[in-house]
A protein has these predicted regions:
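Acidic, metal/ion-coordinating pockets
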Residues: 1-165
Length: 169
C-alpha cells in the first residue's frame, strides 16, 4: 500500500499522517451523526508504521465515530507501535496537549492539532478531539514558541453535507 512513498517518509525527520478513523477492537457502537461513521482495523496501525510515519494526527471529524472507548484505544494502539499522537484526549484539556518532538541538533518541533466542531469534540469530562478554538490555539502556540524551535499547526476541516461554512472558520 505505501511502497511508493515509504522511501520519502523514512528520509524525513518527522513524517506525519492523519488517521481519519478510530480502530475498532470490539463491537463498536456508531454514534448518531450526519454522514458516514468510519472505522478501521488494527492492521491499519501496522500499515502506518510500515510506511515510516512517526506522528499521527487524530483531531478530525471521524475519531469519535465508534465512541470514546475506540477513540482512546486508537491512540493507545498507535503509541504502543511507536507512533506519536496528537489532537485527542480523555477530556478537552488532555486533547489540547501540544506534542513536542526533540530532534537533538535540529531542534524541537511543537505540533498543535485541532479540528472543526462536528461530532468528535472532547469536553471537560469526555474523550474526543481538540476543538478548533482560535483563542485557545493562540495561547498554545505562544507557549509552544517558548519551548520549541519550530511550531507546526495542523487544523483538520471537513464539514460534511453542507454548503455553508462552519461558524468556527
Amino acid at each position: 500500500l505505501f511502497d511508493d512513498i515509504k522511501y520519502l517518509t523514512e528520509q524525513a525527520d518527522v513524517s506525519i499522517i492523519n488517521f481519519e478513523f478510530p480502530i475498532v477492537l470490539h463491537a463498536g457502537v456508531p454514534i448518531a451523526k450526519s454522514g458516514p461513521t468510519l472505522q478501521g482495523q488494527p492492521a491499519a496501525v501496522d500499515a502506518v508504521k510500515y510506511a515510516g510515519f512517526n506522528v499521527c494526527t487524530l483531531a478530525n471529524n471521524h475519531i469519535l465515530d465508534q465512541g470514546t472507548k475506540c477513540c482512546i484505544e486508537t491512540r493507545e494502539l498507535l503509541e504502543n507501535a511507536g507512533i506519536k499522537t496528537v489532537g485527542i484526549g480523555k477530556n478537552s484539556a488532555e486533547a489540547a496537549t501540544v506534542l513536542y518532538i526533540n530532534q537533538k541538533e535540529k531542534g524541537t518541533l511543537a505540533i498543535v492539532n485541532c479540528c472543526e466542531h462536528e461530532f468528535s469534540i472532547a469536553t471537560d469530562t469526555t474523550a474526543g478531539a481538540n476543538p478548533l478554538n482560535p483563542i485557545q490555539q493562540y495561547y498554545n502556540i505562544q507557549e509552544a514558541r517558548t519551548k520549541a524551535d519550530y511550531v507546526l499547526v495542523i487544523v483538520h476541516g471537513a464539514v460534511s453535507y453542507t454548503h455553508l461554512r462552519a461558524h468556527e472558520t
